[in-house]
Regions:
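C-terminal accessory nucleic-acid interaction domains of nucleic acid-metabolism proteins
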Residues: 1-66, 76-81, 134-155, 161-167, ...
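Short, well-structured alpha-helical interface segments that form or flank functional binding sites
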Residues: 63, 172, 195
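Basic, nucleic-acid-interacting segments
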Residues: 70-168, 172-174, 178, 182, ...
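Short beta-strand
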Residues: 86-90, 188-194, 235-239
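Short, contiguous, pocket-lining structural segments
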Residues: 169, 192-194, 212
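Non-catalytic alpha-helical scaffold/packing segments enriched in small hydrophobic residues
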Residues: 176, 199, 216-219
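Short, conserved phosphate-binding/catalytic loop or strand-edge motifs used
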Residues: 192-202
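Catalytic palm subdomain of template-directed nucleic-acid polymerases
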Residues: 201-213
Length: 319
């Protein structure tokens, strides 16, 4: 966003849509800026801001909130309105952490009803900071939002390598899969997960059902496996994954989730799931992932997926 618009409307619906909107023109006296809280304001949203959640590096709740405060302009389009799952660690990383898929007592989050389940989302920076308040060390998103009637916004291919594979082998595999997707007229964007793997995000036109997107993600994954069965597998059984890269297409099943770009990870080194350009990926060392400590001192200001948001890609088989 770059400008403010003045709009009259009769009411705001429960899904945050304007009823009977009338565009009155642009505001020439105001220019758009993303919200950014002061340190004192951040602390008012947090319970126990000095609580240490990453003991090894003495990273506090406030440190995590400060990081999200800075990267909000970059994370917002991956996060806002998406159905969310959280990995929460109230006692810090490694101590009785748990996945949270339902809103429950997290009253500051926006409720979303999905098949009679009380799920949740956030719509602004304050909501993101509240996730930190609830000790969320990982933010996982679904591939959809209520605003688009839960039509998938992207396909994600999760490349989960065996520990024996080198960083370079995994990166070369990502480039190989990129070329396969290109032949299907699909551009993809890499994200290092903060662990040993890579996610490839493929933006989509919101024109397909959840079942269509799941089926095509499975078909493409099987195609990749068929081309190099000695390197790729779509089987989740550990005994079948030795010295191979597991392509987890199940991330695209309705109700499944994957780590949000720019989210912290719940490990002792406080790594971060980070989107990178293909040029950056070629130089990346998956054995030395990006950490929150590095980003706290120098937060990114530009999104590396420059062309991601303008793509309206269609799945060839369904055109």
């Amino acid at each position: 966003p770059k400008f403010y618009a003045q709009i009259n409307y009769t009411e705001l619906t429960s899904s945050l849509k304007l009823r009977h909107p009338v565009f009155l023109g642009l505001r020439e006296d105001k220019f758009f800026q993303y919200p950014n809280y002061s340190n004192d304001e951040l602390k008012t949203f947090l319970t126990s801001p000095n609580k240490i959640l990453y003991p090894r590096h003495k990273i506090t709740k406030f440190d995590i909130a400060s990081y999200y405060n800075e990267v909000y302009p970059l994370i917002r389009q991956h996060l806002i309105g998406r159905v969310l799952n959280l990995y929460r660690c109230p006692k810090g990383v490694g101590n009785n952490c748990f996945f949270n898929r339902h809103r429950g007592s997290m009253r500051n989050l926006v409720p979303i009803q999905v098949k009679n389940q009380n799920n949740f989302t956030v719509y602004d920076l304050k909501g993101l900071i509240y996730l930190v308040r609830y000790n969320a060390l990982e933010i996982h998103t679904w591939n959809c939002s209520k605003e688009n009637d839960f039509a998938p916004k992207e396909i994600v291919f999760d490349l989960d390598p065996a520990v024996s594979l080198s960083s370079q082998m995994v990166i070369e595999a990502a480039f190989e899969i990129r070329e396969i997707l290109k032949r299907l007229e699909l551009d993809s964007f890499p994200k290092v997960t903060g662990g040993k793997g890579i996610h490839l995000h493929v933006p989509l036109s919101a024109a397909y059902s959840q079942l269509q997107v799941y089926d095509i993600s499975k078909s493409i994954s099987l195609l990749i496996e068929e081309q190099r069965p000695q390197l790729y597998t779509t089987t989740s059984r550990l005994k079948d994954r030795k010295s191979k890269i597991f392509i987890d297409y199940l991330r695209n099943n309705f109700g499944s989730s994957y780590i949000c770009p720019f989210s912290t990870r719940a490990n002792e080194n406080a790594t971060v799931a980070f989107p990178v350009s293909w040029q950056e990926l070629n130089k990346y060392d998956l054995k030395d992932p990006l950490t929150l400590m590095k980003l706290i001192s120098k937060a990114p200001v530009k999104h590396p997926w420059r062309d991601y948001w303008g793509l309206d890609q269609r799945i060839k088989i369904y055109k």
